[in-house]
Swiss-Prot record:
InterPro entries reported in the protein's UniProt record: Ac/propionate_kinase (IPR004372), Aliphatic_acid_kin_short-chain (IPR000890), Aliphatic_acid_kinase_CS (IPR023865), ATPase_NBD (IPR043129)
PROSITE patterns assigned: ACETATE_KINASE_1, ACETATE_KINASE_2
Catalytic activity as recorded in UniProt: acetate + ATP = acetyl phosphate + ADP
Residues where Mg(2+) binds: 8, 382
Positions annotated to bind ATP: 15, 206-210, 281-283, 329-333
Gene Ontology biological process terms, A to Z: acetate metabolic process; acetyl-CoA biosynthetic process
Database matches in SUPFAM superfamilies: Actin-like ATPase domain
Similarity field: Belongs to the acetokinase family.
Site feature: Transition state stabilizer: 178, 239
Quaternary state and interactors: Homodimer.
Keyword tags: ATP-binding, Cytoplasm, Kinase, Magnesium, Metal-binding, Nucleotide-binding, Transferase
Name the UniProt record assigns to this protein: Acetate kinase
EC supergroup of this enzyme: transferase
Length: 397
């Protein structure tokens, strides 16, 4: 038995989960929020009960020390020697990393070099890695990349129709994200279907505040909706998804905003929030639609129609689909959105059962038994994938 910590470090947050491996039992989990502010929030689950503390946590190093102290204080581990591996989520691995990797000084330098591709995320991930290195320098640490799973995409999927030298010189191409989630749910789908992953054509719909669709054929990602950044693809909570690129200079001209300001609008003030004008939360928008709000209805129609574009396109790319998977916050919990996405797909062999669709946050087949295309709800578990990779690469277990 070995104890593995899975870490997801954001710019002002640190999400953690402690696993006992190989049983994959979750021993504790928690979240440090508002790092760098005087009213930081530390939450940890001990014996099924949440403990919450508001205190001053000036940086990630202090957050890590506090987390490790809480593990010993609460008897979750007797000593820090019991921790045999650490797994870090890293958003961008570029073309350099097609798999998770044991962290060395060189790997850390490479992740730093890739920060220009993910300026909001990679620097925060690096801070998390370094904070743990200071406290547990001899414990093997593994980097698990959001982009790695999509490195199997063919050139026809990842190249943009731009001058080829932009790809060669600047690495401009589609990378795709949510890879750890897409990998987990497609592997789990194969188990639930009782079929080898290598024989399956799967559509994975990761629908949360950030959303992406992936076409997974034979266990390999062959295309995905996000692009060079997580701004591309379907309409999201606050992100625009795909737009006409000529709109950017046009908006700049009309509003007097800079490139950075327009990109900020596309990232943080667009999507469902932009369309409705009041919320990025689908629950609020569905409630407003029920009250007769026109913009709520339009926003939901846009959200669903963009998902349809990818389902149709990827079904054509794979010459058919064996199963459609719904995961992440909306995919796992919104029966209404699943129903709207699936309605009208009978032409491609999709027959969903409205009764079975009435599930929230649990694994379920929601298609009729006779449906040629199976529809499965699978709660994602990126943390367990991180823990598995630590066992696989860190020589622990």
């Amino acid at each position: 038995m070995s104890k593995i910590i899975a870490i997801n470090a954001g710019s002002s947050s640190l999400k953690f989960q402690l696993f006992e491996m190989p049983s994959e039992k979750v021993l504790t989990k928690g979240l440090v929020e508002r790092i760098g502010l005087e009213d930081s929030i530390f939450t940890i689950t001990v014996n099924g009960e949440k403990q919450k503390e508001i205190t001053n946590i000036p940086d990630h190093a202090v957050a890590v020390n506090m987390l490790l102290n809480k593990l010993t204080e609460n008897g979750i581990v007797k000593s820090l020697d019991e921790i045999s591996g650490i797994g870090h989520r890293v958003v961008h691995g570029g073309e350099k990393f097609a798999d998770s990797v044991l962290i060395t000084d060189q790997v850390l330098a490479d992740i730093e070099d890739l920060s220009e591709l993910a300026p909001l995320h990679n620097p925060a991930n690096i801070v998390g890695i370094k904070a743990f290195q200071e406290v547990l320098p001899n414990v093997p640490a593994v980097a698990v990349f959001d982009t790695a799973f999509h490195q199997t995409m063919p050139e026809s999927a990842y190249l943009y129709s731009l001058p080829y030298e932009y790809y060669e010189k600047y690495g401009i191409r589609k990378y795709g994200f949510h890879g750890t989630s897409h990998k987990y749910v497609t592997e789990r789908a194969a188990e639930l279907l009782g079929r080898p992953l290598e024989s399956l054509r799967l559509l994975s719909c990761h629908l949360g505040n950030g959303a992406s669709i992936a076409a997974v054929e034979g266990g390999k990602s062959i295309d995905t909706s996000m692009g060079f950044t997580p701004l591309a693809g379907v309409t999201m909570g606050t992100r625009s998804g795909n737009i006409d690129p000529a709109l950017i200079p046009y908006i700049m001209e009309k509003t007097g905003q800079s490139v950075e300001e327009v990109v900020n609008v596309l990232n943080k003030k667009s999507g469902m929030l932009g369309l409705t004008g009041y919320s990025s939360d689908l629950r609020d928008i569905i409630a407003k639609e029920e009250e007769g709000d026109h913009r709520a209805k339009v926003a939901l129609d846009v959200f669903v129609s963009r998902i349809h574009k990818y389902i149709g396109s990827y079904a054509a790319r794979m010459k058919g689909v064996d199963a459609i998977i719904f995961t992440a916050g909306i995919g796992e919990n919104s029966a209404i959105i699943r129903e709207r996405v699936l309605e009208g797909l009978e032409y491609m062999g999709v027959y969903f059962d409205a009764k079975r669709n009435n599930v929230f946050g649990e694994e379920a087949f929601i298609s009729f038994p006779h449906s040629p295309v199976k529809i499965i709800v699978i709660p994602t578990d990126e943390e367990v994938m991180i823990a598995r990779d630590v066992v696989r690469l860190g020589n622990v277990g």
